[in-house]
């Protein structure tokens, strides 16, 4: 039935809009129909003269959110915020990571979300330095940092919140130092956001702030900030981008070279992750912070 319908409709149009790389089966079907059309041209059969990737067009539409969409995303963010607060209150040494995840999911469902927008990251201690660690059976310890990256989906729109905090309720001095560096970088990145700037400008600001912080703390020695940035020495500790588009998907579609416009929604979530290394003082080991 689909083949017959496509054949009938394609004979009526000069332009074909198709989502490239979305379905191998659909592409094969369309290609076979067009091939048959070309072989029948002598008999007067018409066929599309141009083929466009409709994915790029749809992506550009999805980049700009209207008031209704933003309202939905705000509600999703509210649910996720409450879930993070619930998890923080529940958190204490002796709990398992999966127990914290269960608290998040309970709050999502309680307020109308059908499911998480992405697999929840609940990472304690050394796991906080693993970017996409899924909640496991590790037991939280007194001196751990707990990193939670979790968000719900509501009415087709995703939310994405990351928070990092001490399981004991009190930062050690090294933990606080790293936390303050990351928090400052996030605030500075947010400050410059406005229509017209390049998407990656906030990332550049976050990189500079974190690089300076790493120098000040002593995690990077004998290097100027320009040397750190030029040689990407910060990537030992901050190896991902600061943000991504957010919308119907948590990593939503859209061209990152597009200047920012009113209605675009994206995350700002810098981080710093210090894995054990002989070059680094042990007091900083296994501190993973993302905000």
Where are the predicted features?
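Active-site neighborhoods and metal-handling regions in enzymes and metal-associated proteins
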Residues: 1-291
